[in-house]
C-alpha cells in the first residue's frame, strides 16, 4: 500500500533536555494530526492526537470525494468548512490555503493571531498544501511525502 500523508505538528512552548527543570506557566500542550490518501483505493482519512481534551470537533474536517482539512495551534474552526467549500469549487489546496489566510480578519493580533495558525488541506487526489504560522509555537512544523511505506515513520523537524 502506498499512501500520501501530511503531518502538521504543534507544541506550545519549547522543549529540550535542558528545559526539564523549568516550570512552564501551564502544562505543556501538543497536538499531532495526520491526513492520508491511498491512491490504490482513493480513500482519504485523518487522525489527531492531543493533550487538549476533545479536539475532535475542531481539528479534522473531511468530505468524501472532496478532501480533508486539519486545523490546529491557534485554531479558527471556520478554516475547515471554508477549505472543503473551496476544494469542492475546484480550487487547488495551495489556492485554498492562500485564500483562507488572505480572508482571515486576525481579530486579536496580540493573543489569538493569524500568525499562530497551523493547517493542512488535502484534496481527494492526495494533493496537499500546509501553513505553519511563525507564531504557532517555538516547536512546530510539517512533514509530507507523496508515498510512504506502512512501517515508515517520519517526524517534522523543529524550526
PLM features: residue spans?
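Bacterial N-terminal signal peptides
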Residues: 1-12
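Alpha/propeptide regions of enzymes that mature by internal proteolysis
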Residues: 18-131, 135-159
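Boundary at the C-terminal end of the N-terminal hydrophobic targeting segment
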Residues: 11-19
